[in-house]
């Protein structure tokens, strides 16, 4: 769950949400209250944290925390 922990840390910092609110099934917009600008900033922070590039076409598919974790794990980070 190391990737989840790192993703949670980034989400908590970027969205100013309680760490307990960030679960694998949490939806970034619906559950965590992010708007479109928050999502862009979150993707940029994730790219920096994991040293990856997330194309816009892929970022649009990242709806939940699980989507983010699975995508980053798929990249081998």
Swiss-Prot record:
Residues 1-76 form the Carrier domain. It is found in: Cytoplasm. GO terms for cellular component: cytosol; membrane. Keywords: Cytoplasm, Fatty acid biosynthesis, Fatty acid metabolism, Lipid biosynthesis, Lipid metabolism, Phosphopantetheine, Phosphoprotein. It comes from the Bacteria. GO terms for molecular function: acyl binding; acyl carrier activity. GO terms for biological process: lipid A biosynthetic process. The modification O-(pantetheine 4'-phosphoryl)serine is found at residue 36. Signal peptide: none annotated. 4'-phosphopantetheine is transferred from CoA to a specific serine of apo-ACP by AcpS. This modification is essential for activity because fatty acids are bound in thioester linkage to the sulfhydryl of the prosthetic group. Pathway: Lipid metabolism; fatty acid biosynthesis. Belongs to the acyl carrier protein (ACP) family. Carrier of the growing fatty acid chain in fatty acid biosynthesis. This is Acyl carrier protein. It comes from Campylobacter curvus (strain 525.92).
């Amino acid at each position: 769950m190391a990737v989840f922990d790192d993703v949670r840390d980034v989400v908590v910092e970027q969205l100013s949400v309680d760490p307990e609110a960030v679960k694998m099934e949490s939806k970034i917009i619906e559950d965590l209250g992010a708007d479109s600008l928050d999502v862009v900033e979150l993707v940029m922070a994730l790219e920096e944290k994991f040293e990856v590039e997330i194309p816009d076409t892929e970022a649009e598919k990242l709806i939940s925390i699980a989507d983010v974790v699975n995508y980053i794990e798929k990249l081998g980070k």
